[in-house]
Amino acid sequence: MAFHGIREVENYFIPFLQRVKSRNEWKKINASIIIHGLSQSSFMVTKMVDFCDKIEDMDYATRLFNQVSNPNVFLYNSIIRAYTHNSLYCDVIRIYKQLLRKSFELPDRFTFPFMFKSCASLGSCYLGKQVHGHLCKFGPRFHVVTENALIDMYMKFDDLVDAHKVFDEMYERDVISWNSLLSGYARLGQMKKAKGLFHLMLDKTIVSWTAMISGYTGIGCYVEAMDFFREMQLAGIEPDEISLISVLPSCAQLGSLELGKWIHLYAERRGFLKQTGVCNALIEMYSKCGVISQAIQLFGQMEGKDVISWSTMISGYAYHGNAHGAIETFNEMQRAKVKPNGITFLGLLSACSHVGMWQEGLRYFDMMRQDYQIEPKIEHYGCLIDVLARAGKLERAVEITKTMPMKPDSKIWGSLLSSCRTPGNLDVALVAMDHLVELEPEDMGNYVLLANIYADLGKWEDVSRLRKMIRNENMKKTPGGSLIEVNNIVQEFVSGDNSKPFWTEISIVLQLFTSHQDQDVITNNNALAFIGIV
């Protein structure tokens, strides 16, 4: 076939490139393109690089690009985009530097979004700010897609100031602009600012609502997370799998079983149970809400279990004190060739701790380090020390506190203190208490624990001294509380709090309940210590 000019040849091959489906077809077309002398055509090579991106053959894309003597900005953008899609961020930076150094062309509005994403993925704030400077110098500064990518980059660097500055200076904002800023604030736990921004938004999408739910869950404000979940539904927005995964931990922490069951049915109806993340969150919710049988059933029905699935089930067994269930699940995990992680071993150690299986605890701790090269964190040391202390192996537990690579925290010293109620362990108790006074000077519970130990030993002068210290320091116990779920709404009641609506009526009902309960009679001094009265 005779062609008149390079453009006609290019136009001839474009439909073939658009229809190609297999690598064999692609190779034949590519050979024809080279035969017709188009290896230097930036236009044709751009199309070929785009196809390489689609089939994830970046080695060939690189060879095609390198053959072109003078690539234009469209070809540069194509190879930068392809490298970004395939997570080759260092190559993105290399090509960008080549564009600045060797090309007569400048980066444009299609270049910068991929550059900002690559800098963020590399975690290089320095590079990101340099590219931002290039945008101000070369690029069309006020372009919403570019500025959205810039906001997202700064948010990933936890740079709220620069992110908000870009947002404030935008000529035009779209819903992605708002959601990028909102999601960043929520991810960093800045929920007051996130809420203010949320209420300014005219177009709230599922992404906006999910960011708020996830943000509140992340900082432990579980009631607020569930409130936003309900408000989202009242606003007519149906939850997706991400919003379900975001709210289920709040259900788990608050014991909101009814809402959790509703989410399970909703997820089943919408086909979300095919998503491993949704099933993992449901297993955790059922475990923490006390319905371990439902968690086991759901786990058994899952396909494609990942390490989180196995670890969540192991932790569920541990939460219910079923060490044998946790160990058997771990054995199944090994047979399934799924590599455990630190969370897996934390669940195993916790399970061993609940039932005093200290030898198994030591074995799993050693297995974690030696077989899987997982460096124990302070939580792992805490569980190991707890299992040894509960089993009466205090000397070994104390030895670990001296040799562990990080300073023991208050949980570790508290675990040691609470295990010192047998005779002969007063010295360990006093050492633990010294550290607790330093770490938690106002925690009355630690003084109560020590007073219990003194009471067990008949050291009533020391009990009296501690009682005087508590009064002089004006220490107060953290008030007890309880949660109750009615009509899918969780209500929290805290000791001494009379701010609830209908508090008078509630008090009358509570008095009726207590009047029918048997009154326990305290018959000896030791009982005073056991119920926390010092």
Curated annotation (Swiss-Prot):
<feature type="repeat" description="PPR 9">
    <location>
        <begin position="306"/>
        <end position="340"/>
    </location>
</feature>
<feature type="repeat" description="PPR 4">
    <location>
        <begin position="143"/>
        <end position="173"/>
    </location>
</feature>
<feature type="repeat" description="PPR 7">
    <location>
        <begin position="240"/>
        <end position="274"/>
    </location>
</feature>
<dbReference type="Pfam" id="PF20431">
    <property type="entry name" value="E_motif"/>
</dbReference>
<feature type="repeat" description="PPR 6">
    <location>
        <begin position="209"/>
        <end position="239"/>
    </location>
</feature>
<dbReference type="InterPro" id="IPR011990">
    <property type="entry name" value="TPR-like_helical_dom_sf"/>
</dbReference>
<feature type="region of interest" description="Type E motif">
    <location>
        <begin position="412"/>
        <end position="487"/>
    </location>
</feature>
<feature type="repeat" description="PPR 1">
    <location>
        <begin position="41"/>
        <end position="71"/>
    </location>
</feature>
<feature type="repeat" description="PPR 5">
    <location>
        <begin position="174"/>
        <end position="208"/>
    </location>
</feature>
<dbReference type="GO" id="GO:0080156">
    <property type="term" value="P:mitochondrial mRNA modification"/>
</dbReference>
<protein>
    <recommendedName>
        <fullName>Pentatricopeptide repeat-containing protein At2g20540</fullName>
    </recommendedName>
</protein>
<feature type="repeat" description="PPR 3">
    <location>
        <begin position="108"/>
        <end position="142"/>
    </location>
</feature>
<dbReference type="Pfam" id="PF13041">
    <property type="entry name" value="PPR_2"/>
</dbReference>
<feature type="repeat" description="PPR 2">
    <location>
        <begin position="72"/>
        <end position="106"/>
    </location>
</feature>
<feature type="region of interest" description="Type E(+) motif">
    <location>
        <begin position="488"/>
        <end position="518"/>
    </location>
</feature>
<feature type="repeat" description="PPR 11">
    <location>
        <begin position="377"/>
        <end position="407"/>
    </location>
</feature>
<dbReference type="InterPro" id="IPR046960">
    <property type="entry name" value="PPR_At4g14850-like_plant"/>
</dbReference>
<dbReference type="InterPro" id="IPR046848">
    <property type="entry name" value="E_motif"/>
</dbReference>
<feature type="repeat" description="PPR 8">
    <location>
        <begin position="275"/>
        <end position="305"/>
    </location>
</feature>
<dbReference type="GO" id="GO:0005739">
    <property type="term" value="C:mitochondrion"/>
</dbReference>
<dbReference type="Pfam" id="PF01535">
    <property type="entry name" value="PPR"/>
</dbReference>
<feature type="repeat" description="PPR 10">
    <location>
        <begin position="341"/>
        <end position="371"/>
    </location>
</feature>
<comment type="similarity">
    <text>Belongs to the PPR family. PCMP-E subfamily.</text>
</comment>
<dbReference type="InterPro" id="IPR002885">
    <property type="entry name" value="Pentatricopeptide_rpt"/>
</dbReference>
<dbReference type="GO" id="GO:0003723">
    <property type="term" value="F:RNA binding"/>
</dbReference>
<keyword id="KW-0677">Repeat</keyword>
